[in-house]
């Protein structure tokens, strides 16, 4: 056997069929697509249909669900709070809660509470009443001389 004698096995490569080239070809006019209907038109694919093969969304396992009662918190970074204090929208000694943040324009509306996050720097001594707080944010507030109280549904979890 020589390199120039190597060939594919018989039937390994199927020759393509040219459709729509006359009645005598056996695949003329409609080209094996049948008559009329969505599937006979060009440019139309049925979403998720993989030619009879089991579609990907059915091959993969079902997973999880969307909890309708999951609380939706407003995330507020310490940098935003400090900017509001610097602009005179928040009092330095006041207690900062969801209502105060809405009034200051830091958040548009209070959802299920406010979660305090640590991005940015807080210089003002403030006491916060929030639904949730990250460990680093709590540390930063206490470092600035303030305090954080967790209120609402997360308060029970924090107390335990």
Curated annotation (Swiss-Prot):
Gene3D superfamilies xrefs: 3.100.10.10
InterPro entries under this entry? Ribosomal_uL15, Ribosomal_uL15/eL18, Ribosomal_uL15/eL18_sf, Ribosomal_uL15_bac-type, Ribosomal_uL15_CS
Pfam families on file: Ribosomal_L27A
Q: Name one GO molecular function term.
A: rRNA binding
Q: Name one GO cellular component term.
A: cytosolic large ribosomal subunit
Would I find NADP among this entry's keywords?
Answer: no
- The region called Disordered is annotated at 1-41
Family affiliation:
Belongs to the universal ribosomal protein uL15 family.
- Record protein name field: Large ribosomal subunit protein uL15
Q: Which organism is it from?
A: Parvibaculum lavamentivorans (strain DS-1 / DSM 13023 / NCIMB 13966)
Q: Which gene encodes it?
A: rplO
């Amino acid at each position: 056997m020589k390199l120039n004698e190597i060939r594919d096995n018989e039937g390994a490569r199927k020759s393509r069929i040219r459709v729509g080239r006359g009645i005598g070809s056996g695949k003329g006019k409609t080209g094996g697509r049948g008559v009329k209907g969505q599937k006979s038109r060009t440019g139309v694919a049925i979403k998720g249909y993989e030619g009879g093969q089991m579609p990907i969304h059915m091959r993969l396992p079902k997973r999880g669900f969307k909890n309708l009662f999951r609380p939706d918190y407003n995330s507020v970074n310490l940098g935003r709070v400090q900017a509001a204090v610097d602009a005179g929208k928040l009092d330095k000694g006041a207690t900062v809660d969801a209502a105060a943040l809405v009034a200051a324009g830091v958040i548009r509306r209070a959802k299920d509470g406010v979660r305090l996050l640590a991005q940015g720097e807080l210089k003002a001594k403030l006491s916060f009443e929030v639904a949730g707080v990250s460990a680093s944010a709590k540390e930063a507030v206490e470092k600035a001389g303030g305090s954080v109280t967790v209120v609402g549904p997360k308060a029970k979890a924090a107390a335990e």
